[in-house]
């Protein structure tokens, strides 16, 4: 049992640190750098062999799972704040020379290679956030028309400003509308659902009633130990969707 409580304590400490740094950052923006470092640390911890081993042992423990859920919610809230700060402060020159962003953009490009997006595509990105790197990359690299959708109206406003700053607003738009009233769905050819979208099954159930059967959907999620910083997805879709 000692191992369990050591693991539980490490998760609680991470949650506490991220929560406090989020509060500090809202009061003093220079703390966002510390918060970003802590979120990077969380990403590194997720892939460590020791973390994976501990997760395999304690993943079904209710107390551990509750604490992991709290950490994920805290980290997701912190990431939203970090993205808003980055979007407000970063310039085009900084983006071109930023190693982290360059790596992230390349990761997006690699992830979408098999998704058959081209200049004729109309892409809906659900959960685009305030720092919509995926949306901007799709438009810039593939020449596709992209709409980013997010429930956070402030994030939508900031994302619009980013698109304008990067001179790509002719291909990119953002909205906080409900799926049921989104006119863009009528012309959508591809849909991407972000990993930090919590209610994925509800979104899929809505889409099933709203889209053409030929629309391609990419569902991003993190199961297992990756659920520490990603919302998991554990539903069988074989009866309702054609899967690749």
Please give the residue ranges for each predicted region.
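Conserved SAM-binding loop
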Residues: 159-160
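Conserved SAM-binding loop of SAM-dependent methyltransferases across substrates and taxa
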Residues: 130-144
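Conserved SAM-binding strand-loop segment of SAM-dependent methyltransferases
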Residues: 167-179
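A short SAM/SAH-binding and catalytic strip from SAM-dependent methyltransferases
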Residues: 187-202
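Conserved Class I S-adenosyl-L-methionine-dependent methyltransferase catalytic core
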Residues: 40-118
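Conserved SAM/SAH-binding beta-strand->alpha-helix loop
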Residues: 151-154
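Conserved class I S-adenosyl-L-methionine
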Residues: 119-130
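C-terminal substrate-binding/active-site "lid" region of AdoMet-derived donor-dependent transferases
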Residues: 204-244
């Amino acid at each position: 049992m000692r191992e369990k409580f050591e693991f539980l304590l490490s998760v609680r400490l991470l949650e506490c640190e991220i929560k406090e740094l989020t509060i500090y950052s809202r009061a003093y923006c220079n703390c966002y750098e510390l918060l970003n470092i802590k979120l990077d640390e969380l990403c590194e911890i997720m892939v460590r062999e020791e973390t994976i081993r501990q997760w395999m042992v304690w993943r079904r423990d209710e107390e551990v799972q509750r604490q992991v859920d709290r950490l994920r919610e805290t980290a997701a809230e912190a990431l939203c704040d970090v993205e808003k700060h980055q979007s407000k402060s970063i310039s085009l020159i900084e983006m071109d020379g930023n190693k982290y962003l360059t790596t992230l953009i390349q990761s997006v490009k690699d992830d979408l290679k098999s998704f058959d997006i081209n200049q004729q595509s109309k892409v809906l990105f659900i959960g685009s956030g305030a720092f919509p790197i995926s949306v901007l990359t799709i438009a810039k690299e593939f020449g596709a028309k992209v709409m980013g959708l997010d429930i956070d109206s402030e994030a939508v406003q900031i994302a619009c400003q980013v698109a304008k700053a990067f001179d790509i607003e002719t291909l990119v738009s953002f909205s906080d509308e409900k799926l049921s009233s989104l006119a863009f769905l009528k012309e959508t050819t591809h849909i991407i659902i972000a990993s930090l979208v919590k209610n994925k099954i509800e979104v899929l159930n809505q889409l099933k009633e709203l889209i053409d059967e030929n629309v391609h959907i990419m569902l991003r999620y993190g199961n297992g130990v990756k659920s520490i910083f990603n919302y998991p997805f554990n539903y069988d879709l074989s009866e309702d969707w054609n899967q690749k």
